[in-house]
Amino acid sequence: MGVFVFDDEYVSTVAPPKLYKALAKDADEIVPKVIKEAQGVEIIEGNGGPGTIKKLSILEDGKTNYVLHKLDAVDEANFGYNYSLVGGPGLHESLEKVAFETIILAGSDGGSIVKISVKYHTKGDAALSDAVRDETKAKGTGLIKAIEGYVLANPGY
């Protein structure tokens, strides 16, 4: 299995505690509201803590797909949230899993800096294509932007 690591960063105007709550705690309720392709999130295994596996169902090209999302670690005190995409037809066939290590830091003017380390675990000795990496990055960035947009549009959140 090959492992390919990339670090990304996203800057938000939302304060770290509020952005963490939306991304790590309330995403299951927010995602279907802000991403029209998302059909729902359900717990397949676990109690919501580390080790929990969730199924995110998505409508793509007119058919329902899903990806399995495993919660690896939660560090509420430091706004850390680690998870992996571990299966389902929505996970590219060349990938064994994709692990995300996320931490939200205080940014300027009360906003946040979301730092993400992404580890792509490919099957066998397969290389990671730029297309797969770009698609995964675009979906991740889109998810963060959509959830951030929800928080900004709902001041009472």
Curated annotation (Swiss-Prot):
GO annotations of cellular component type: cytoplasm; nucleus
Keywords linked to the UniProt accession: Pathogenesis-related protein, Plant defense
One Pfam entry name: Bet_v_1
Induction pattern: By abscisic acid (ABA).
MF terms in GO: abscisic acid binding; protein phosphatase inhibitor activity; signaling receptor activity
Alphabetical list of InterPro entries matching this protein: Bet_v_I/MLP, Bet_v_I_allergen, Plant_def-hormone_signal, START-like_dom_sf
Keyword set includes Ribosomal protein: no
GO biological process, one term: abscisic acid-activated signaling pathway
Domain of life assignment: Eukaryota
Family: Belongs to the BetVI family.
Protein name, entry field: ABA-responsive protein ABR17
Natural source organism: Pisum sativum
